[in-house]
Amino acid sequence: MKVFIQSIVAQLLLNPYIFWRGYQALPPKKSCRIPFILFFVLELSLYFFGFIFRNELPDNVIITIQYICNTWYIASIYITLSLLVLELIRLSQRIKPWFPKWMKGHWQQTKLTLFFLIVFGVTGLMIHAYHTVMNPIVKNVYITLPKAAGDRDSLTIVMMSDLHIGEVIGKDLVQKYVALSNAQHPD
């Protein structure tokens, strides 16, 4: 239930803010705004459909819904943070004007450029994160301790963090992590 409360907060607080700012940035053409509106309607519908019918839906369907909604949840956090940075920049402009004249003269184009910059930036970040999860790296760290440990001169330790094991990071991926861990031959 705690996870639902967290994600419902994101759905009901972050999505309207992202929608409002994105809608303002898009040109007032139906060809631009209708797909944007549909994206938010479909995502919200999918989220509530998955939540309401989570006990009745087959696992493969609910896991697919979780992949989509969890990905959007994380992306919406990054998008909101980006938008808040832009809000601070905009606030600084109101306090002490510093934007170049060409930017003020082409404000709609500037907003559209920032819209796509955020979309592509967050998309790139999400792709990189997915790649990192699917292809974990082994990093060797050598630590010298000033104390003697009996007759041992070395110790191999394997550490993994931030796995977030659940429906999305499931059994297959965990087995991959365990195999990678065992390949290091820990003591």
Listing of model-derived features with the role each one plays in the protein:
Residues 1-134:
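Non-catalytic terminal accessory segments
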Residues 133-187:
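Membrane-embedded segments
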